Amino acid sequence: MLQIVTIKSDAHTYTLYIEKMYHKRSIEMKNGTQKDKHLDFFSYLISAALIIAICLGGYAEKISVAMASFMFHSDGTTKEISTTVTVSDTQTTTVPPVTESMKPHKSEICDITETPSDIKELIKKYTKLFADDKKGGGIQSVTYKKVGVTDEYKNVRVKNTTETKSLNIKKILSEPLELSVDKSKPAVLIFHSHTSEGYEMTERDWFAEGYTARTNDENRNIVRVGTEIADYLEKSGYTVIHDKTIHDKSYSDSYSESRKTVAKHLEEHPEIQIVLDIHRDSMTQNNGDKIKPINTIADKKAAQLMIITGAEEGKVKDFPDWEDNLRFAVHLQNKCETMYPGLMRPMLFSQRKYNMDMTHFSLLIEMGSEANTLEEACYSGRMLASALASLMDEYVKEEKK
């Protein structure tokens, strides 16, 4: 029977493939018919001719094309093998030119809306485990748009609580970032000052009696969200350090402890520029109900995020380069809202430092609240990473040739 094998490979790979197939078929054909042997011999003659054609053609790795070779076998199966065959740009081919619409986009790295398998298992596990929970209080879903906004330009909304700093968002967006990223070296550091911050495991409009929103289980707390961000950035081609150190054994010492962690990584990798302290918020109404910042993006519920950036004034000292962080925050807020409208709560610009004085691209980001589910927060983590990767793409160092 005729078997069609689609090959995408260079000549060396193709040669190895034919050699492997030859040995395999030699064994199989010991018990074969004379007709089968003739067909096999004929198929390898064709393959040898194709290899010679590739070599004589001077093919170079410039334009990828598909090549089909015909193999005659007796099992009647059809297979497709994905490797690579290339031709020189001087060759005439019928392959259509690659258009912009055909080029892969970052969002095609994976289905950004797909719930990771480990989280699906956690949802299943805790749905059973919490089946007999008693209600301790309500959860209110809120979509934040303009509450508390003091400054707005296009899709960037900011809540400015500083006493002396004014904002010109339009001007800030017109200013490029002093960012230069080398993809071969660590460019991003992710850590968690409040490492034990956790989430709801199942979606419901109430929280359980005696429920605690903290856990050191990194499969269920803010570390899992950091992992989602780091993984997506790495799949986008960036080198990321995700530090999972528990910094909040003593809650009051969290920021001093995380500062040591950041200092260690900056000393070991001075090329790190973007430093993200990933948290989740906690908001409670006067009646005890917890607030869940939420929006629906691409038909899937997502935890709303809030970027926090600070300024040197009043009680905040030794923060001379705060404007660099502010610029980065505004650009990232704009990118997130452009790519995923409704993902962001208004950015908080305040009289705070939170270790953001350590680099020019340091931010604290609140990934939903304790009333959000882990699934909602991780979904938002992937969208944040996608937007950050898109922003970083604009500042990648060109490789020296």
Predicted regions located by residue number:
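Hydrophobic membrane-insertion alpha-helices, especially the h-region
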Residues: 43-58
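Second-shell loop/turn segments in exported
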Residues: 176-177, 211-222, 244-255, 262-263, ...
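A short, glycine/acidic-enriched catalytic loop
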Residues: 209-212, 283-321
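Catalytic-core regions of hydrolytic enzymes
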Residues: 215-294
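Active-site-adjacent mobile loop/cap segments within catalytic or ligand-binding domains
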Residues: 343-401
